[in-house]
Regions:
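Conserved functional hotspot residues or short segments at active or partner-binding sites
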Residues: 385-446
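PDZ/PDZ-like groove recognition
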Residues: 97, 136-147, 151, 233-238, ...
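Extended, small/polar residue-biased N-terminal targeting/export presequences
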Residues: 81-146, 194-196, 200-213, 220-226, ...
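Terminal targeting/pro-maturation regions of precursor/exported proteins
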Residues: 2-108, 143
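Cleft-lining beta-strand/loop regions that shape enzyme active-site pockets
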Residues: 23, 40, 55-62, 148-163, ...
């Protein structure tokens, strides 16, 4: 499965939100857009100056020292740069804020978000209906952007798009070499508006290009998808992200698996970018027996550390299990994989070393509706090990060939795939998991 359509990362909203900043008054009455952005920048300078306590930031102080350099540069640009039409105060402020957060080195996690990005992320994590075309993507940059799966009841599901298709253009613009983040704004848009994708497809050694026009519509992306693999009677369950209903959807999938008396479960966390911490804890607890010293993770902050214990009532604590991860398994998904591996040593984790997130985020709203997410806690595996910037290493390292589209329960269910068809698809990581649960007899049993 490819990355989540909106690349949602892990965060924890359980703490009280910081106080909203007061609004400085400027000469001339009302506030211009530039003044609103300057307010946001002043808030960030307060962070840069180190003025924050355990509960909230004192945003009424004026920056001194190194932070004053930002305002000096800002004033010099506005006062002296000759091409005045090129000066975009909001763009400068957002760039400065992003650069400050990026300098922390919490790559792929602590970050700045515009109001639009924040709204889209919150919508996705609440599993609310979203507007788009309904595809999961992977690749980008040095690799082509590929459709890995299509969301049911979405515009893409009603088109001739297929998993494995490469998107090489959007509305006539060549996107080869773009990252998914760069291409996404071209694909997304307002409800009811059209978008034309240029698709490259290879079938039987023949490559063709054609255009597909879709109308962007509202749809709801699933959080958990599952498929009982015929003949093998193995439940293949994938968590796409840890949104607000992840555990509720997981329990439904596990109840169905238990009803079918499955022989084992494959928990696929590949390309899962994370989500809510409480949902990660709840999902991990479905597979781990609760008890003394049974923890999902350890949270370490400036003031000390605390443990998050395994919750009682898990539905699959005795079921044979294999977990799949890859380099895009991040944050909350890494918490789940690590918790299962530490608490159930008989369970094998298969795939590639994970992303290595390692921090718990807290949201700090800025005055114009944008926000910064800061890692205010580091999380550790139940044994005290940190995976920050190094990732979690699976028991069995298995790479997925570049030319192979990973199988997913979405695809398997849509196409009613047999066990043999799944094995023949060449998903080396999934096949390794099937062999792990069948003692190497998956192909024979299929």
């Amino acid at each position: 499965m490819g990355t989540n359509p909106f690349d949602i990362e892990s965060f924890d909203r359980s703490e009280e939100q910081p106080a909203k900043p007061s609004t400085p008054q400027y000469p001339g009455g009302g506030q211009s857009a530039a003044q609103v952005v300057i307010t946001a920048l002043l808030v960030i300078i307060a962070f840069a100056s180190g003025w924050f306590g355990n509960a909230y930031v004192n945003r009424n102080n004026i920056a001194t020292g190194d932070a004053q350099l930002i305002l000096q540069a800002w004033n010099d640009i506005n006062q002296y740069y000759v091409v005045t039409g090129s000066i975009d105060n909001k763009k400068m402020a957002y760039a400065a804020i992003s650069a400050m957060v990026d300098s922390l080195g919490d790559t792929g996690h602590s970050r700045f978000e515009t109001p639009e990005q924040l709204a889209r992320e919150q919508q996705q994590l609440q599993n609310a209906p979203t507007v788009g075309i309904g595809v999961y993507l992977s690749g980008g940059g040095s690799k082509p952007i590929r459709i890995d799966a299509i969301i049911p009841d979405s515009p893409a599901s009603r088109s001739k798009l297929q998993p494995g298709d490469l998107i090489v253009g959007v509305n006539g613009k060549d996107i080869q070499g773009m990252t998914i983040d760069q291409a996404r704004p071209l694909i997304l848009g307002k409800k009811g508006t059209p978008v034309t994708l240029t698709i490259q497809r290879t079938t039987g050694g023949t490559t063709s290009r054609f255009d597909v026009t879709l109308t962007r519509e509202e749809f709801t992306a699933p959080t958990v998808v599952s498929y009982i693999i015929p003949n093998l009677n193995i439940a293949y369950i994938q968590v796409l992200q840890f949104s607000s209903d992840a555990d509720a959807q997981m329990r439904k999938a596990l109840q169905e698996a238990n009803k079918q008396h499955v022989q084992g479960i494959i928990l696929d966390l590949r390309d899962n970018p994370g989500g809510y911490l409480d949902q990660a804890r709840a999902v991990a607890s479905e597979f781990i027996k609760a008890g003394p010293k049974k923890n999902v993770l350890i949270e370490k902050s400036r003031s000390g550390q605390q443990t998050q214990s395994v919750l009682p009532g898990g539905l699959a604590t005795n079921t044979p299990l294999t977990v799949l991860v890859n380099q895009n398994t991040a944050s909350a998904a890494e918490i789940v994989a690590g918790a299962i591996a530490i608490n159930r040593p008989e369970v094998h984790v298969i795939g590639e070393t994970t992303f290595g997130t390692g921090t718990v985020l807290k949201e700090f709203m800025l005055s114009d509706g944008s926000a910064i997410w800061l890692g205010t806690e580091e999380w550790l595996l139940p044994n005290g090990e940190s995976i920050y910037h190094k990732g979690f290493t699976p028991d069995q390292k298995v790479a997925l060939p570049d030319n192979v589209v990973p199988v997913s329960p979405l695809v398997a269910k849509e196409q009613h795939l047999t066990a043999k068809q799944i094995i023949d698809a060449g998903d080396t990581q999934l096949n390794a998991a099937l062999n792990d649960l069948t003692n190497g007899q998956a192909a024979a049993a299929a």
